[in-house]
């Protein structure tokens, strides 16, 4: 299933991202992994063209992935992609998407301008926002968690700097420059000014209730 044996052009996710520690999609059709494969096939098609090889199979797969994502994973009534679609049973959609389900399709070019804009509005509306407070008084911005999933489990609900920064990039890529700048500035202030090691950039924010400032100089960053 990781390599699409059923030929539906949507992919399971296994060790695709840092958060994969506790993500289990059980063979389902996953948004972020499908978006990565879309970008990979587009790049392979471009390389094939440059070296004079046939790009047909790569271009076809990229086009098919995008079509399947739009038909099965994009929820137009909600304005964002589903986290994934179950493989078995009722083939239900997991409708409470994580940050990586929003910023990855945007970064991979697997979204229209309208989809990108609407998906970032989902983050505004449904992803928890945590005020960044200085001197216990002044709120200077906000950071965000990766999901609203409960109960807490490592890698499925964190306040992680690389995730916040990726989401800030998605705001910029969606044309929402003010929101992107505000979130990025807030994240850098949270870690590089207010953190325990000023000027450093770790993985987890001290606003992460369970882990606090874990994994200083973590390679995933």
Regions picked out by a protein language model, each given a short descriptive name:
Residues 37, 163-164:
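N-terminal alpha-helical segment
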Residues 91-94, 153-157, 167-169:
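Generic recognition of flexible, low-complexity loop/linker segments
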